[in-house]
């Protein structure tokens, strides 16, 4: 595994080292690995005005795999603490916090998300206490079969949930409609992540799923340009609230117009995910 950041500008190296120190203070990890675009030297900082007049911004995340022995605190709580202490960075921080046994189980199965991190990542901190298992290398045929199976399961769910959402919308049952629409969106993110990486995060939070899938498709990420548009951020927040707030909180409200826009947008998302996933599967095997 690589240990040098010399392929990055000094300013980026200093930021990464500062983040590593914050992670160490919060988590007490066994290993910290930088992975993704900054590890590979392929990071992007992309800003432009679209034909719709909306400003779009795509900035690569700082991606870290944080390896622990045991976690007494929930992963999302640790992530929230770290994110609150790194808000001053322009680059978003993406954290994968996992126990070593979970990671090694994935490596032994042939899960290419963790295998790619071990192969391409940059080791930023290591206590020397734990080791990664030798990753099982899937054959191209196995990789394609697994990706197709994941796609068949999760994309089909998105299709069924979208039917349910539209039916509820026609009945003016807007809370049920947005709940089903959340399930559509979640299923589409899961399908994308599993087809491309073989990995599905343990979260229903759409903001986090969007961040996890960010490096897989800029077009998918910018389907909701929440970073540069308050209107888009509010729409996506309403969609995110469909999972719990729409079902259990009396003060949750969504208008017919807002829901109609979301249904149309997620319908576009479904078409996009179908295209990028089937293209990916065709390249395998």
Q: What residue spans do the PLM features occupy?
A:
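Short gly/ser-rich loop at a beta-strand->alpha-helix junction or flexible surface loop bordering the NTP-binding
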Residues: 30-51
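Terminal alpha-helical segments
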Residues: 25, 31, 72-80, 94-285
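Metal-dependent nucleotidyltransferase catalytic core
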Residues: 2-26, 45-108
């Amino acid at each position: 595994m690589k240990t040098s950041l010399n392929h990055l500008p000094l300013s980026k190296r200093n930021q990464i080292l500062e983040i590593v120190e914050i992670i160490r203070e919060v988590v007490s990890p066994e290993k910290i690995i930088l992975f993704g675009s900054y590890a590979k030297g392929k990071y992007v900082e992309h800003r432009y005005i679209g034909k719709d007049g909306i400003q779009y911004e795509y900035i690569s995340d700082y991606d870290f795999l944080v390896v622990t022995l045991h976690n007494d605190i929930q992963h999302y709580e640790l992530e929230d603490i770290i994110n609150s202490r790194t808000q001053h960075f322009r680059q978003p921080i993406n954290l994968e916090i996992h126990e070593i046994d979970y990671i090694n189980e994935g490596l032994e199965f042939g899960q290419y998300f963790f295998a790619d991190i071990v192969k391409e990542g940059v080791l930023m901190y290591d206590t020397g206490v734990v080791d990664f298992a030798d990753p099982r290398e899937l054959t191209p045929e196995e990789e394609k079969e697994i990706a197709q199976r994941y796609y068949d399961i999760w994309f089909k769910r998105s299709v069924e949930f979208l039917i349910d959402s539209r039916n509820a919308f026609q009945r003016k049952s807007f809370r049920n409609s947005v709940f089903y629409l959340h399930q559509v969106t979640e299923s589409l993110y899961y399908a994308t992540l599993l087809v491309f990486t073989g990995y599905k995060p343990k979260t229903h939070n759409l903001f986090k799923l969007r961040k996890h899938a960010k490096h897989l498709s800029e077009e998918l990420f910018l389907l909701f340009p929440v970073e540069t548009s308050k209107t888009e951020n509010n729409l996506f927040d309403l969609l995110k609230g469909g999972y719990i707030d729409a079902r259990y909180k009396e003060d949750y409200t969504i208008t017919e117009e807002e829901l109609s826009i979301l249904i149309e947008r997620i319908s576009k998302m479904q078409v996009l995910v179908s295209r990028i996933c089937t293209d990916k599967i065709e390249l395998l095997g």
